[in-house]
From Swiss-Prot:
Keywords: Cytoplasm, Lipid biosynthesis, Lipid metabolism, Phospholipid biosynthesis, Phospholipid metabolism, Transferase. Pathway: Lipid metabolism; phospholipid metabolism. This is Phosphate acyltransferase. It comes from Solibacter usitatus (strain Ellin6076). GO terms for biological process: fatty acid biosynthetic process; phospholipid biosynthetic process. The lineage of its organism: Bacteria, Pseudomonadati, Acidobacteriota, Terriglobia, Bryobacterales. Catalyzes the reversible formation of acyl-phosphate (acyl-PO(4)) from acyl-[acyl-carrier-protein] (acyl-ACP). This enzyme utilizes acyl-ACP as fatty acyl donor, but not acyl-CoA. Homodimer. Probably interacts with PlsY. Signal peptide: none annotated. GO terms for molecular function: phosphate:acyl-[acyl carrier protein] acyltransferase activity. The gene is plsX.
Length: 337
């Protein structure tokens, strides 16, 4: 049974959402969850869930908590007994196979890189985002915020890591990998994308060339590569569009009697539609290139988000993603020597 260490004090709704998500995961996913946080607080929350004693859940005490206002440096250097750091340490020490936190993103990344270490061959770990498409198959975007400034070589590594993730976790047989730019032609883009293009072309991946922002939801590409600045903007725009679309749809349906009747008749279909757009269904963003695996949840994660983040962490570990990343980057390094 895989064991996942969960930062029970991270996120806007901690520890309630974290504990409920852990209970759901332990009860349905066949994984053990270690809740890391202030023991009395976490235990009190856990006692609210009937049957929790029969589930593979353990509590590990951590006296400190990293807040959303803490800098990454403060989280790493000053709060040595934070729930975030203790959870990461459990992975480093082999007590858990994955680390999940919905806390301060910068602090989680800094903690995971320092405590767990980086996979050999990886220059910079990258955050991967998963998005729905019109074709039904999800697309992944790498990087969505870990590295705002990137080199062409880093984008090439992101392409390799995204390809491996898509194959092993999303089960795409031959993922189509595209480089995000402002035009499909090879010469389009900025200095970074033009320099990265031939590097991606030389890789053992199904590189389809440049793709544009509109391709992100079309379903004609499986992995999109970009620097973390552009990726994070795309992520936040997507979240805003989903919120706006849900609001406008609800207002339109509630505006007239016929709309209300239509809503009642199509409630099941609309529920499934909302589910496809709900970021909580995707759990969290894997930090690719960190030893042991690290999944970073949205700060507003609810119990469903936490459960799915634990699921992603278990799939990541079970799919041996890091092992394949290390092997492929080692091969590329030798080929370049």
């Amino acid at each position: 049974m895989l064991t996942i260490a969960l930062d029970a004090m991270g996120g806007d709704h901690a520890p309630k959402a974290e504990v409920e998500g852990a209970v759901r995961a332990a009860g349905s996913l066949g994984v053990k969850v270690i809740l890391v946080g202030q023991q009395d607080v976490v235990r009190r929350e856990l006692e609210q869930h009937e049957g929790h004693r029969d589930l593979p859940i353990e509590i590990v005490h951590a006296s400190e908590r990293v807040t959303m206002e803490d800098s990454a440096a403060k989280a790493v250097r000053s709060k040595r007994d934070s729930s975030m750091r203790v959870a990461s340490r459990l992975v480093r020490d082999g007590c858990a196979q994955g680390f999940v936190s919905a806390g301060n993103t910068g602090a989680v990344m800094a903690t995971a890189k320092m405590v767990q270490g980086v996979v050999p061959g990886v220059d910079r770990p990258a955050l991967l985002g998963v998005f729905p498409t019109m074709q039904g198959n999800p697309v992944v975007l790498v990087d969505v915020g870990a590295n705002v400034d990137c080199s062409p070589e880093m984008l090439a590594q992101f392409a390799v890591m995204g390809d491996i993730y898509s194959r092993n976790i999303l089960h795409r047989r031959n993922p189509r990998v595209g480089l995000l730019s402002i035009g499909e032609e090879e010469h389009k883009g900025n200095d970074l994308t033009r320099a990265a293009w031939p590097l991606l072309k030389s890789l053992r991946i199904n590189f389809i060339g440049n793709v544009e922002g509109r391709d992100m939801y079309a379903g004609n590409v499986d992995v999109i590569v970009c620097d973390g600045f552009i990726g994070n903007v795309a992520l936040k725009v997507s979240e805003g569009l989903v919120d706006m679309f849900k609001k406008l749809l609800r207002e339109s349906l509630e505006a007239t009697i016929s709309g209300k009747i239509g809503y009642a008749l199509s409630k099941s279909a609309l529920t499934n539609f909302r589910k496809r757009l709900d970021h909580s269904e995707y759990g969290g963003a894997p930090l690719l290139g960190v030893r042991g695996g690290c999944i970073i949840g949205h700060g507003s994660s609810n119990a469903n988000s936490i459960k799915n983040a634990i699921r992603v962490a278990a799939e990541f570990s079970g799919g041996k993603v890091n092992q394949q990343i290390e092997e492929e980057l080692l091969r590329l390094g030798k080929a370049g020597d």
